[in-house]
């Protein structure tokens, strides 16, 4: 059973400070924001954390040393540390040239055109061909390219060596599966230096068949349902539903509704994620007795 707390945009040194409370609240996993070097370390735009220049570790969220210290301390509390890994795309050049890689992007990637997907934007999310072969508003990486795979595997193993217990694969739905001609997920997940207790990929608005295919390689973070509830991680709210201008459908929901719905999820699903609402007074709701009670109750069969 996994009770995951997403402390989005929270510095690692603060996550470390919160570990006693996280443990007391019944969370056994904490998810931290992407740590890859991004095109700017500005705190004004949260989405810039999802515009990495490559796979070098260290940004305003924290350093390698701070991550190592966090993992070491979390182990004392029996808490897994999960890092959000941006593996589908890199930073863009500008808002106008949004499918062009930023000039400071990893040089080896820039010098190999085959490292990138075709410069076409997804316009129909119901078209699987577009979802896996086009871009989602940023320069998409070619998951079948051996250079791309090696760089991602090297980064993930560097995280593993620092003590990380798992990963969230951002935009996993846009990375093709073996039956679609792509060996990315088996290659990457089977190349880690050690077994990890929790790896999950973001696959939103998906049918049961697609979820089951991704679940062969990892758990699936989703707002959809599945026949095998142990294969998925459910949430009421995430960063996109709260912060995004286009997808922010939970922004107007009161914290009482979020907590109520989370309690219902936790009663029926073995794996759940609670998003701490950053930049607001509601951020502290994850510390409420209601959330604690939901996490510590047994899941109904």
Set out the residue ranges of the language-model regions.
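Glycan-binding loop/region signatures in secreted carbohydrate-active enzymes
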Residues: 91-150, 229-236, 243, 263, ...
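Residue-level preference for long, well-ordered alpha-helices that form the structural scaffold
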Residues: 59, 63, 144-148, 177, ...
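N-terminal structural segment of carbohydrate-active enzymes
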Residues: 1-83, 88-92, 98, 127-143, ...
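Active-site-proximal helices and loops of the catalytic beta/alpha 8
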Residues: 3, 17-23, 34-36, 41-50, ...
């Amino acid at each position: 059973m996994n009770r995951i707390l997403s402390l989005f945009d929270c510095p690692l040194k603060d996550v470390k400070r919160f570990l006693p409370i996280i443990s007391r609240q019944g969370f056994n996993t904490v998810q931290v924001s992407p740590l890859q070097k991004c095109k700017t370390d500005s705190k004004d735009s949260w989405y810039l954390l999802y515009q990495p220049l490559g796979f070098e570790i260290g940004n305003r969220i924290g350093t390698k040393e701070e991550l190592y210290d966090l993992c070491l301390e979390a182990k004392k509390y029996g808490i897994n540390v999960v890092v959000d890994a941006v593996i589908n795309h890199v930073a863009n050049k500008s808002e106008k040239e949004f499918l062009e890689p930023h000039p400071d992007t990893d040089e080896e990637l820039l010098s190999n055109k085959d490292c990138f997907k075709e410069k076409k934007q997804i316009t129909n999310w119901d078209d699987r061909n577009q979802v896996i072969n086009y871009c989602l508003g940023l320069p998409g990486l070619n998951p079948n390219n051996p250079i791309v795979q090696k760089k991602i595997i090297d980064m993930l193993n560097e995280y593993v060596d620092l003590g990380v217990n798992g990963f969230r694969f951002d935009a996993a739905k846009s990375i093709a599966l073996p039956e679609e001609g792509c060996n990315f997920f088996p290659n990457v997940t089977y190349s880690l230096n050690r077994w990890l207790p929790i790896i999950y990929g973001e696959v939103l608005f998906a049918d049961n068949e697609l979820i089951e295919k991704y679940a062969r390689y990892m758990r699936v973070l989703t707002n959809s349902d599945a026949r095998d509830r142990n294969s998925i991680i459910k949430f009421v709210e995430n960063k996109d539903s709260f912060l995004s201008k286009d997808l922010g459908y939970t922004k107007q929901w009161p914290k009482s509704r979020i907590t109520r719905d989370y309690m219902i999820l936790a009663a029926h699903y073995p794996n759940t994620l609670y998003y701490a609402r950053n930049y607001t007074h509601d951020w502290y709701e994850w510390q409420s007795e209601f959330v604690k009670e939901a996490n510590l109750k047994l899941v109904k069969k």
